[in-house]
From Swiss-Prot:
Sequence positions bearing N-acetylserine: 2
Protein name as it appears in the record: Membralin
Source species of the chain: Mus musculus (Mouse)
Assigned protein family: Belongs to the membralin family.
Pfam families named in the record: Membralin
Region (Disordered): 1-27, 461-515, 546-574
PANTHER family: MEMBRALIN, MEMBRALIN/KINETOCHORE PROTEIN NUF2
Known role: May have a role in the ERAD pathway required for clearance of misfolded proteins in the endoplasmic reticulum (ER). Promotes survival of motor neurons, probably by protecting against ER stress.
Binding partners and assembly: Interacts with ERLIN2.
Length: 574
C-alpha cells in the first residue's frame, strides 16, 4: 500500500552521485526501519514478476479474456440463483407444515423428514397410547428407523448451540425413579446409525429435554412424536421444477425445513428448540427485529473484523519470516537462535479468539473460517500484486463493496442462505482480482519487459555511440552528456531516481518508452526487480547481512546484492 507509492526524485538520493543508494527510490520513503521487511517485499515482488511473465507466455490474450469472462459469468449465475432463491423462498412464506399447525403435539416432538417418492403416510403419530385427531399410529415395525445419532456427530461445532441453552431436567419424586436419571437423557457411546448426507431430518419441540431423549426413552415415557414426511416431487411448497432442481442439486432442504418450522414457532409463546438430526446441531428460536438501519451496524462490524484479521495475519507472516531469516543465519554462521515462541503463540491465540468471536456473530465456524481465508487472500493480493496506481487506488474499493454486500445480506436476513451469499461475494472478489491483473498489472509488466529488451539491445558504452540515446532522453545537446552514464543504469536497481536534472530524466524516459508519468515509479521498480533475478538464486545470501562480494568501486560505498555484475562498468564511468 503506502510502501509502494512513488517517491520524489531527489529525496532518497541525497542529490546526485549515482551509486547503489537509489535502489529504494521508487518504493517511496523508507517507512520500515527493519531491513528484513524490505527484503521480504523484494522477494515477493520478484516471485510475482516471474509468475506473471510465465503466465503471459503460457496463456495468450484470447484465453485470458475468455477465462476472465467465465469467472464473471459464474459470479453472475450464482448471484441470479441467490436472488431467485431469496425471492421464491424468503419473501414468500413456506407453508409445508400448514396442515399440522393446529394438530402437532405441544407436549411432544414434531419430526419433519424429506423423502423422495416415499410410500409412508404424510403424518404419523408415534409413541402415543391413542390417536390424536384421527391420525394414523405407526406400527412398531418401523421403530428401527428412528434410532439415535452417534456420539461422533455431536462432537462438532454444535456444542456452542447447546451451551446457550439450559436443559430442563425434572427430578423425579420417588427414589426408584431417581436411579434411572441417567437413562432419561441417554447419550449412547456406541454408534447406532450413521445418517447419509442426502437425508434431511429435523425435530422441533417446546421443551429442550425432549430433543435429547433417545427413541427408546420416548417410547417408554409415552412422549408423542409426530412424524411429517415431505415429498419434493408431490408437495407444492417446494416451488416449481427449477426451484426443486436448485434445492436438490445445490442448496439442499435444510433451509426449507427450518423455515417451515419457524412458521410454526412464530405462533407459540415459547418459541421452542430445533435439532438437525443428521448434523446434530441444536438451535433456539428467538425473536429478532431487523430494521434497515442494520446495514450501518453490518458495515462497522465488517470494518472491525477485516482490519483485525488483516493486522493479525500480517503480524504472523512477519514473525514467520523473521524466524526463517534467523534459521538461515544459524545454518550459515553457526549462530545460536532463539525460537520466537511468545510472538507466535500470541498471534495464534489472537487468531483463535478472533475466529471464536466471528463464529458467535455468524453462528457458524465454517463461515467464520472462510471469511478469514477471504480476507487473507485479499490482503496478500493487495500487498504483492497491486503495484500500479490504478490498482492501488481502486481495487480495495471493489473488495470492500463485495465484502460488505455479504455482511449486509447476512445481518439483514439473519443468516439465511449465508453460505450462498459468501460464495457469491467471493466470486465477484475473484473476478476483480483477475480483471485488475489482466488490465493493469500484466500490461505494465510486459511493457517494462519491452523497455528492458530495448535497453539491452543498445550498443555498449563508448566515446561516440551512446551519445544519441542520452541526448534524446535528456533533451540536452551540450557536452555534459558524456559524464552522465545514468541511463544505462536502468538495467539495475539504481535506475529509479532521476539524475542531476530533477524531473527531466524520468520524464524523458517515459516519453521515449511510452510510459505514463503516474506509473514511472512502478516502471523503475520493476526494472530493479528484473535485475534481481540473481536475488532468488542466492536467497540465503541476500537474507543475511548483505555484504559486497566483489571489490567495491570508489564511487559505490554501499553496493547492493541485487545489482547484477553487468552493471559494474557503469560506476567506473563516473
Amino acid at each position: 500500500m503506502s510502501e509502494h507509492a512513488a517517491a520524489p526524485g531527489p529525496g532518497p538520493n541525497g542529490g546526485g552521485g549515482g551509486g547503489a543508494a537509489p535502489v529504494r527510490g521508487p518504493r517511496g520513503p523508507n517507512l520500515n526501519p527493519n531491513p528484513l521487511i524490505n527484503v521480504r517485499d523484494r522477494l515477493f515482488h520478484a516471485l510475482f514478476f516471474k509468475m506473471a511473465v510465465t503466465y503471459s507466455r503460457l496463456f495468450p490474450p484470447a484465453f485470458r479474456r475468455l477465462f476472465e469472462f467465465f469467472v464473471l459469468l459464474k459470479a453472475l449465475f450464482v448471484l441470479f440463483v441467490l436472488a431467485y432463491i431469496h425471492i421464491v423462498f424468503s419473501r414468500s412464506p413456506i407453508n409445508c407444515l400448514e396442515h399440522v399447525r393446529d394438530r402437532w403435539p405441544r407436549e411432544g416432538v414434531l419430526r419433519v423428514e424429506v423423502r423422495h417418492n416415499s410410500s409412508r403416510a404424510p403424518v404419523i403419530l408415534q409413541f402415543c397410547d391413542g390417536g390424536l385427531g384421527g391420525l394414523e399410529l405407526e406400527p412398531g415395525g418401523l421403530e428401527l428407523e428412528e434410532e439415535e445419532l452417534t456420539v461422533e456427530m455431536f462432537t462438532n461445532s454444535s456444542i456452542k448451540f447447546e451451551l446457550d441453552i439450559e436443559p430442563k431436567v425434572f427430578k423425579p419424586q420417588s427414589g426408584a425413579d431417581a436411579l434411572n436419571d441417567s437413562q432419561d437423557f441417554p447419550f449412547p457411546e456406541t454408534p447406532a446409525k450413521v445418517w447419509p448426507q442426502d437425508e434431511y431430518i429435523v425435530e422441533y419441540s417446546l421443551e429442550y429435554g425432549f430433543l435429547r431423549l433417545s427413541q427408546a426413552t420416548r417410547q417408554r415415557l409415552s412422549i408423542p412424536v409426530m412424524v411429517v414426511t415431505l415429498d419434493p416431487t408431490r408437495d407444492q411448497c417446494f416451488g416449481d421444477r427449477f426451484s426443486r432442481l436448485l434445492l436438490d442439486e445445490f442448496l439442499g432442504y435444510d433451509d426449507i425445513l427450518m423455515s417451515s418450522v419457524k412458521g410454526l414457532a412464530e405462533n407459540e409463546e415459547n418459541k421452542g428448540f430445533l435439532r438437525n438430526v443428521v448434523s446434530g446441531e441444536h438451535y433456539r428460536f428467538v425473536s429478532m427485529w431487523m430494521a434497515r438501519t442494520s446495514y450501518l451496524a453490518a458495515f462497522v462490524i465488517m470494518v472491525i473484523f477485516t482490519l483485525s484479521v488483516s493486522m493479525l495475519l500480517r503480524y504472523s507472516h512477519h514473525q514467520i519470516f523473521v524466524f526463517i531469516v534467523d534459521l538461515l543465519q544459524m545454518l550459515e554462521m553457526n549462530m545460536a537462535i532463539a525460537f520466537p515462541a511468545a510472538p507466535l503463540l500470541t498471534v495464534i491465540l489472537a487468531l483463535v479468539g478472533m475466529e471464536a468471536i466471528m463464529s458467535e456473530f455468524f453462528n457458524d465456524t465454517t463461515t467464520a473460517f472462510y471469511i478469514i481465508l477471504t480476507v487473507w487472500l485479499a490482503d496478500q493480493y493487495d500487498a504483492i500484486c497491486c503495484h500500479t496506481n490504478t490498482s492501488k487506488r481502486h481495487w480495495l474499493r471493489f473488495f470492500y463493496l463485495y465484502h460488505f454486500a455479504f455482511y449486509a445480506y447476512h445481518y439483514r436476513f439473519n443468516g439465511q442462505y449465508s453460505s450462498l451469499a459468501l460464495v457469491t461475494s467471493w466470486l465477484f472478489i475473484q473476478h476483480s482480482m483477475i480483471y485488475f491483473f489482466h488490465h493493469y498489472e500484466l500490461p505494465a509488466i510486459l511493457q517494462q519487459i519491452r523497455i528492458q529488451e530495448m535497453l539491452l539491445q543498445t550498443p555498449p558504452l563508448g566515446p561516440g555511440t551512446p551519445t544519441a540515446l542520452p541526448d534524446d532522453l535528456n533533451n540536452n545537446s551540450g557536452s555534459p552528456a558524456t559524464p552522465d552514464p545514468s541511463p544505462p543504469l536502468a538495467l539495475g536497481p539504481s535506475s529509479s531516481p532521476a539524475p542531476t536534472g530533477g524531473a527531466s530524466g524520468p520524464g524523458s524516459l517515459g516519453a521515449g518508452a511510452s510510459v505514463s508519468g503516474s506509473d514511472l515509479g512502478w516502471v523503475a521498480e520493476t526494472a530493479a526487480i528484473i535485475s534481481d533475478a540473481s536475488f532468488l538464486s542466492g536467497l540465503s545470501a541476500s537474507l543475511l547481512e548483505r555484504r559486497p562480494t566483489a571489490p567495491s568501486t570508489p564511487d559505490s560505498s554501499r553496493p547492493d546484492p541485487g545489482v547484477p555484475l553487468e552493471d559494474a562498468p557503469a560506476p567506473a564511468g563516473s
